[in-house]
Swiss-Prot record:
Residues 1-53, 115-148 are annotated as: Disordered. This is Homeobox protein lin-39. Residues 165-224 bind DNA. SUPFAM superfamilies: Homeodomain-like. Keywords: Developmental protein, DNA-binding, Homeobox, Nucleus, Transcription, Transcription regulation. GO terms for cellular component: nucleoplasm; nucleus. Signal peptide: none annotated. Residues 1-46 have a biased composition (Low complexity). Pfam families: Homeodomain. It comes from Caenorhabditis elegans. The lineage of its organism: Eukaryota, Metazoa, Ecdysozoa, Nematoda, Chromadorea.
């Protein structure tokens, strides 16, 4: 019985020895990790460089050689911190360089809103134009017959067009009116051939000559309608059936 218990007592320390060695190794690794992190809990730049695989000095020298005087070597530490923060390693946060007043300047924001307001007005104006809403300028265009400039007068066709469209009155010159009056006193009604000749001689269209004669005949009828129809004065004995009265001569013998 004494011989069987002695080997088991000797084997127990041997079995517990690896456990103590593993615990000592884990404690040493944890102590090394805590020592590497440091008292502040933030890794140093050298440790970050070894972890990320980025050397600030090498990158700074390469960038200086490539860009020359345009590269600032002092920004290498900021680049390292940026890569550390992007990898989620909790690198040191550097303040943003430059003036931050522009980010919160109320005048800049108000100017931005003003520009947005003006752009909105332009969009509203475009919408109004699409909807057909007319303003003062549109009313002026309607009053002027849609002509913006004096030379943009609307000339209607003399041969056709819509019946509901009002035609522009033809402005006859003084010479044309004089020649038409002469022709009217000669002939109240013109034939087709004569109408074409008059239109060609006065540089007018056949329709213009026809309309002028129609208006002139209406004017002539109105003038004669207002006048009383009085017979002309005849001289005494001019149209009597008998000859002039003569006294007989008694002393002819």
């Amino acid at each position: 019985m004494t011989t069987s218990t002695s080997p088991s007592s000797t084997d127990a320390p041997r079995a517990t020895a690896p456990e103590s060695s593993s615990s000592s190794s884990s404690s040493s690794s944890s102590s090394s990790s805590t020592s590497s992190v440091g008292a502040s809990g933030i890794p140093s730049s050298s440790e970050l460089s070894s972890t990320i695989g980025y050397d600030p000095m090498t990158a700074s020298a390469a960038l200086s050689a490539h860009f020359g005087s345009y590269y600032d070597p002092t920004s290498s530490s900021q680049i390292a911190s940026y890569f550390a923060s992007s990898q989620g390693l909790g690198g040191p946060q550097y303040p943003i360089l430059g003036d931050q007043s522009l980010c919160y300047n109320p005048s800049v924001t108000s100017t931005h809103h003003d520009w947005k307001h003006l752009e909105g007005d332009d969009d509203d104006d475009k919408d109004d134009d699409k909807k057909g809403i007319s303003g003062d300028d549109d009313d002026m265009d309607k009053n002027s017959g849609g002509a913006v400039y004096p030379w943009m007068t609307r000339v209607h066709s003399t041969t056709g067009g819509s019946r509901g469209e009002k035609r522009q009155r033809t402005a006859y010159t003084r010479n044309q009116v004089l020649e038409l009056e002469k022709e009217f006193h000669t002939h109240k009604y013109l034939t087709r051939k004569r109408r074409i000749e008059v239109a060609h001689s006065l540089m007018l269209t056949e329709r213009q000559v026809k309309i002028w004669f129609q208006n002139r005949r209406m004017k002539h009828k109105k003038e004669n309608k207002d006048k009383p129809m009085t017979p002309p004065m005849m001289p005494f004995g001019a149209n009597l059936p008998f000859g002039p009265f003569r006294f007989p001569l008694f002393n002819q013998f």
